[in-house]
Amino acid sequence: MKKYKVFEMLKRSQNLKYRLAINSLIVGILVGLTIVAHRIIISKLSPIFLNIYKNGRHNFIIVPFIFLTLIALGYIVGKCLKKQPMISGSGIPQVEGILTRNLKMNWFSVLMYKFVGGLICLCAGLSVGREGPSVQMGACIGEGVSKNLKNLDNEEKYLITSGASAGLSAAFNAPLSGVMFALEEAHKNFSPLVLTSAMIASISADFVSKQFFGLIPSLDFRKVEPLPLKNYWTLIILGIIIGISGVIFNKGILKTQSLFKKSKLSIEIKCIIPFVITGVVALIYPILLGGGHDLIMALKEQNFTVTVLFTFIIAKFLFTFICFGSGVPGGIFFPLLVLGALVGNLIGLLFTTYFGIDNTYIINFIILAMAGHFASIVKAPITAIILISEMTGSLNHLLALGIVAIISHLTSDILKSSPIYESLLERILERYAIKDNLTEGKKLLLEIAVSMDSVMVGKCIKDIKWPKNCLVVSILRGDNELIPNGDTEIICGDYLTIMTDEEIYQELLDSI
């Protein structure tokens, strides 16, 4: 395997920012086109399935053929999953694993199988979202561009992050959310290089997406009046309940996944199960099919009773648990937002019934609950606030969104619920014993931002306990680049350029 010399890495790093800008633009355009194609095919095939299900509810003769078709599709997805296990689930944990250098994938194989497998699951109506697969496909394209351009490993990491950001941006028509997700959740690093590359890719992918789908936000709630300040006491209760709901979601996903893992059923049978359940749901509660975009819009237009909402919540929870727990390729972004919206609608209805809140503000509780649910489950409150603002096309709810997001986030912390994607990543690493497959001797050149609460702040380089084979090459302080020595003191806001071995990358991040 090729090993890059230190001199070559340092030489290439001089023009890294400009090279990344161009490469990220390429990645963003390619990701945008790929996700647009994915969305268009889904929009064409999904109505066909819905029409077939509708006919099945009125003509029981075709019901057996519906289930035979779903079983066949489940078998095909199972074969795809057996051929390429990395397409399992949303794909976001896999991307995070790649960014920590613990996980490897065949980018082209994952891209192809994820595209096909995700299409089948989404068109058939399984309770999964397209956003996670979009992130993974974007990351695959980022890695593919990097490998074809023969970039160094640290450059590849930036382009993978850019691709993931672009994938979310194109899926939701939410470019800022794509950038923030890359910074807050995927890369967990707010360095200028990550920000620049992710923003260029995200904006370019969003531009491509809007050429096909227009400027209308994903959830059109632009004419909703903000909740009056006198009613803000309700946000505390909403945040706590949504936080608890998020904990239930996390535990349910992990528990169901464990049950499927312990079963001795073949991968094909495991994938067939959620397809059969989908057939049952299609005949009884068709509104619960798919990720849930139509259900959220139905909450805006229709007045459901408490009993109906409670039934929807229980059914959607169980439906999502089974679909995602089975391992079929599909995300949890939209299902978790739908569940948040349902719980928010229920709470809003109770507030209007028993506490005199005007019923015109029920829609506010729906919007706020989606952000709170995301913050509680994913533990990315800033992304949650920006995402819901972009999806609804309104910035009028920022204060209320912030309150609900932080309260739900704290509630899940108190209940000791871990971020869902980190929990899923731990299981993936354990399953594949990734730590035994690391490449030795490969060098990485990293840029690390020094935060206010970092253990390095106020210390000299010589006083910090660095991992073995780790060298601080330079420090960017404002507009000045310093060549450090052992007596150089690190302050908040510094950006450290560190050279290290690939196998201790995660150890380095954990130690600082």
Where do the protein language model's features map onto the residues?
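Cytosolic Rossmann-like ligand/nucleotide-binding regulatory domains
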Residues: 451-508, 512
